[in-house]
Amino acid sequence: MRVNITLACTECGDRNYITTKNKRNNPERIEMKKYCPRLNKYTLHRETK
């Protein structure tokens, strides 16, 4: 079952990205290095509710 998730920057807290994930294959929270436009650099983004 695929669900929509939001990725938030860990440094500034902005929710910059929306994506989907398969809860059966990835039950834990996703962490990705993504670009943050506010900070103008690549930062760690975590899945939020």
Curated annotation (Swiss-Prot):
GO terms for biological process: translation. The keyword Ribosomal protein applies. Gene3D superfamilies: Ribosomal protein L33. GO terms for cellular component: cytoplasm; ribonucleoprotein complex; ribosome. One of its GO terms (molecular function) is structural constituent of ribosome. InterPro entries: Ribosomal_bL33 (IPR001705), Ribosomal_bL33_CS (IPR018264), Ribosomal_bL33_sf (IPR038584), Ribosomal_zn-bd (IPR011332). Keywords: Ribonucleoprotein, Ribosomal protein. Transmembrane segments: none annotated. The keyword NADP does not apply. Signal peptide: none annotated. Belongs to the bacterial ribosomal protein bL33 family. This is Large ribosomal subunit protein bL33B. The lineage of its organism: Bacteria, Bacillati, Bacillota, Bacilli, Bacillales.
